[in-house]
């Protein structure tokens, strides 16, 4: 199981760094910041499926 620590999120601005993560919603997030902001918005229901594109 892949785990990402989102304790420092949400952040108002994300970098443009591209390190894709695949969420449990089958959506590819461009980086940890994008994923963690979505995780916070989902009230913890979103999880990381795997590293890399979906």
Curated annotation (Swiss-Prot):
Entry's Gene Ontology cellular component terms: extracellular region
A Pfam family per the record: Kazal_1
TM stretches of this protein: none
Keywords noted in UniProt: Disulfide bond, Glycoprotein, Protease inhibitor, Repeat, Secreted, Serine protease inhibitor
InterPro entries listed in its UniProt record: Bifunctional_prot_inhibitor (IPR051597), Kazal_dom (IPR002350), Kazal_dom_sf (IPR036058), Prot_inh_Kazal-m (IPR001239)
Domain Kazal-like: start-end pairs: 4-54
Signal peptide: none
GO MF: serine-type endopeptidase inhibitor activity
Residues carrying sugar: 43
Compartments where located: Secreted
Residues the record marks as site: Reactive bond 3: 16-17
Annotated S-S bridges: 6-36, 14-33, 22-54
UniProt cross-references to SUPFAM superfamilies, sorted A to Z: Kazal-type serine protease inhibitors
Entry comment, domain topic: Avian ovomucoid consists of three homologous, tandem Kazal family inhibitory domains.
Protein name stated in the entry: Ovomucoid
UniProt organism field: Circus aeruginosus
């Amino acid at each position: 199981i892949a785990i990402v620590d989102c304790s420092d999120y949400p952040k108002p601005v994300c970098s443009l760094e591209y390190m894709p993560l695949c969420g449990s919603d089958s959506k590819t997030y461009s980086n940890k910041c994008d994923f963690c902001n979505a995780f916070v918005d989902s009230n913890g229901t979103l999880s990381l499926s795997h590293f890399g594109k979906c």
